[in-house]
From Swiss-Prot:
It is found in: Nucleus. Keywords: Developmental protein, mRNA processing, mRNA splicing, Nucleus, Phosphoprotein, RNA-binding. Residues 91-196 are annotated as: Disordered. This is Probable splicing factor, arginine/serine-rich 4. Residues 19-97 form the RRM domain. May play a functionally redundant role in embryogenesis.
Amino acid sequence: MSRGGGGDRRAAPDINGLTSLKIDNLSYQTTPNDLRRTFERYGDIGDVHIPRDKYSRQSKGFGFVRFYERRDAEHALDRTDGKLVDGRELRVTLAKYDRPSDERGGRGGGGGRRRSRSPRRRSRSPRYSRSRSPRRSRSRTRSPPSRDRRDSPDRRDNSRSRSRSPPPREDGSPKERRSRSRSASRSPSRSRSNSR
């Protein structure tokens, strides 16, 4: 009858005086009777409870065992933490609150740990982005010296091209000289014909 509410009703009046152990990593096949058999050898047990889903009625994978004496609970913790039950290694810890807060704490405790991890991950992301931004700025500062280096050979090339530019201009002048020399050679022949 430990599965039903009868056992829970018996333990409810005195539950605040009990020392609770929270058992994590339970197999879905493990029942309250299985937990009772595992822990009752270490002392008198006042209550055993495994929370179940409202709709599927399936175990949530953790449970609670309450001892009348704190010494018995601590002794059971030392003996059962890491023990294999239904192929699972039990993780046993002292629970801080009674059953209602334990159930909420079990849900909220896991959620609280996950929430505490998420801001750390979020806080890391801006750090990486901030560390990357100065690297980009450094690359921008490095670009001007490379441009100066590129400008210097261009200037040299321009100066060379300017020094080479006069020869084609000189090529034009001999043509003019040839045309002038031809006109000069033709002019004396005309003067001779006139003399005749």
